Amino acid sequence: MMIESSSQDVASLVIALRQQQVIAYPTEAVFGLGCNPDSESAVQALLALKQRPWQKGLILVAAHYAQLKEYIDDDALDDAARSRIFASWPGPVTWVIPVCPTTPSWLTGQHASLAVRVSAFEPVRRLCLAFGKPLVSTSANLTGQPPARSADEVRGQLGAAFLVLDEAVEGRLNPTEIRDALSGELIRQG
């Protein structure tokens, strides 16, 4: 089911998230698949839909830094790392940050870190604010296929078993840049 972006429709997406369902929504460059990061069953459903191995880990996208603090080890960040991160947020840069001991492996995969982003893109911010926490965010496509850039492309690749927020992506040509928070090293060009 495709839905427009009224407050009622955002409420429908939040209900789906609270019911451990997968949703699709526009991001800065492509459509994302998202779910409740605290629900192992929701994350497993997302990984199965995308045909993505759990070992790779996932990205969390948030409306503000405070939404990420229960998942990452904030104390691992020195002043230089904080400066790099906060100079780019909110915005289209994803940072890989060490995690708290309680962060579940269904988010981190085989890593001791987690990729996180505070988005400036309004549809993502609205969803995260309405949900009250970050969302798992991974490109809406089958592993190995091109990412979907429209709601119709999401349906074409992944079917119609979940809600899709039918809005345009922000328009960036490339996925978000990914950097290591501790070193500043570029992991994926944006």
Swiss-Prot record:
GO terms for molecular function: ATP binding; double-stranded RNA binding; L-threonylcarbamoyladenylate synthase; tRNA binding. This is Threonylcarbamoyl-AMP synthase. SUPFAM superfamilies: YrdC/RibB. One of its GO terms (biological process) is tRNA threonylcarbamoyladenosine modification. Its EC number is 2.7.7.87. It catalyses: L-threonine + hydrogencarbonate + ATP = L-threonylcarbamoyladenylate + diphosphate + H2O. Required for the formation of a threonylcarbamoyl group on adenosine at position 37 (t(6)A37) in tRNAs that read codons beginning with adenine. Catalyzes the conversion of L-threonine, HCO(3)(-)/CO(2) and ATP to give threonylcarbamoyl-AMP (TC-AMP) as the acyladenylate intermediate, with the release of diphosphate. The keyword Zinc does not apply. Its main location: cytoplasm. It comes from Sodalis glossinidius (strain morsitans). Residues 7-190 form the YrdC-like domain. Belongs to the SUA5 family. TsaC subfamily. Gene3D superfamilies: DHBP synthase. One of its GO terms (cellular component) is cytoplasm.
